[in-house]
């Protein structure tokens, strides 16, 4: 595979993971709305949880690129969306049980815990893909100074 072809594929994968992350945020707002309303607190909770767990996912992905051998990066990259889909499925099963119980708590605590339940693990695994993609791009171009930028 040529370097340009692999670069286009990697950029498309990064674009798709970003789109899925944005979709999860919007879906979380619609799921939380019946329990906590559509308020500034809900959006604050969703955006705060998103930023925290994106940062943790980037850290986790960078750590995985250092700990896992380079030849296993592709299989690791393929396993991350599967893990994310599994946790999205589990949060779909958990939210009808957890969110009604949280609706009796304060708006701030309930919205943050609800956002955590819905978003934490899928965001970690989706955002961990970006450092691994950058590592794979560096491997395909045989240049240690390429990757994140254009």
Can you say where each PLM-predicted feature lies in the sequence?
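Alpha-helical transmembrane segments of multi-pass membrane proteins
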Residues: 1-150
């Amino acid at each position: 595979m040529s370097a340009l072809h692999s670069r286009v594929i990697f950029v498309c994968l990064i674009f798709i993971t970003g789109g899925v992350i944005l979709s999860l945020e919007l879906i979380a707002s619609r799921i939380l709305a019946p329990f906590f309303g559509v308020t500034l607190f809900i959006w604050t909770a969703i955006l705060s949880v998103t930023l925290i767990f994106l940062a943790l996912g980037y850290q986790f992905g960078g750590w995985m690129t250092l700990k896992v051998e380079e030849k296993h990066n592709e299989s690791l990259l393929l396993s991350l969306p599967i893990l994310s889909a599994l946790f999205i499925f589990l949060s779909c099963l958990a939210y009808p049980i957890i969110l009604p119980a949280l609706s009796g708590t304060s708006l701030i605590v309930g919205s943050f815990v609800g956002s955590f339940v819905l978003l934490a693990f899928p965001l970690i695994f989706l955002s961990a893909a970006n450092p691994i993609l950058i590592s794979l791009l560096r491997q395909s171009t045989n240049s240690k100074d390429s990757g994140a930028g254009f």
